[in-house]
């Protein structure tokens, strides 16, 4: 199998991670992010989570910062949408995502 190179120490790569719940990114992309960092890739990571109130939000922030050790410019944002009611918050979630798109330009 041929290896896929997604970043290097010479060139920065901006990665957008989007999760609905506080551990979705870690479960879905954590291994890839850790491998890229361990391989010397220079990453700027924008980590967005839709739900994380109270203790879950604190846990999500701590976990994100732990995963992002070695990342040059991590940006972690935990929104406070109620994960039990995403379907009824569709408009608000889309507006939030649109506002994030104005400030984030991933590769």
Language-model segment annotations:
Residues 2-22, 26-107:
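Active-site beta-strand->loop->alpha-helix modules in alpha/beta enzyme cores, enriched
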């Amino acid at each position: 199998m041929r290896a896929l190179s997604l970043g290097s120490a010479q060139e920065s790569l901006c990665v957008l991670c989007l999760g609905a719940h506080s551990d979705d990114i870690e479960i879905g992309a954590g291994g890839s992010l850790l491998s890229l960092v361990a391989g010397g890739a220079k990453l700027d990571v924008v980590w967005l989570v839709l739900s994380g109130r109270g203790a879950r939000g604190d846990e999500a922030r701590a976990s994100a910062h732990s995963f992002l050790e070695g990342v040059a410019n991590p940006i972690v944002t935990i929104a406070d949408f109620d994960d039990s009611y995403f379907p009824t918050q569709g408009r608000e979630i889309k507006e939030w995502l649109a506002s994030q798109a104005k400030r984030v330009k991933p590769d």
